[in-house]
């Protein structure tokens, strides 16, 4: 799923400079091509999922098309209020993508489980 997602966002960004890729501390090498080819369309917020969502909403309010992407557990649990207030209630065009459903990242411990 991750590689397919990254390929599609890459293709969209190549066609439209308004497409942005936002990540929260996913410093994986799978982003190397995107970072190299679209440095002004890539933003890494570090371990700050809520701020990533708020920034995505701000970018969307300016006509950008942000894709916010990170581990599902952190996206759902740490960002819920920001998603609710900044994206949903404001009706912002933000694409929110979480990876690692269930126990996919089980080896990293219970903080990374998306099971509730």
Features from the language model and the residues they span:
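Thiamine diphosphate
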Residues: 1-116
């Amino acid at each position: 799923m991750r590689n397919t997602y990254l390929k599609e966002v890459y293709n969209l960004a190549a066609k439209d400079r308004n497409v942005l890729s936002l990540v929260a501390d996913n410093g994986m090498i799978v982003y190397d091509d995107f970072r190299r080819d679209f440095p002004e369309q890539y933003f890494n917020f570090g371990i700050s999922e809520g701020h990533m969502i708020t920034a995505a909403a701000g970018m969307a309010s300016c006509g950008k098309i942000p894709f916010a992407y990170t581990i599902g557990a952190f996206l759902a649990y740490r960002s819920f209020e920001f998603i609710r207030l900044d994206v949903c209630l404001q009706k912002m065009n933000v694409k929110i993508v979480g990876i690692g459903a269930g126990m996919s990242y089980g080896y990293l411990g219970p903080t990374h489980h998306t099971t509730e």
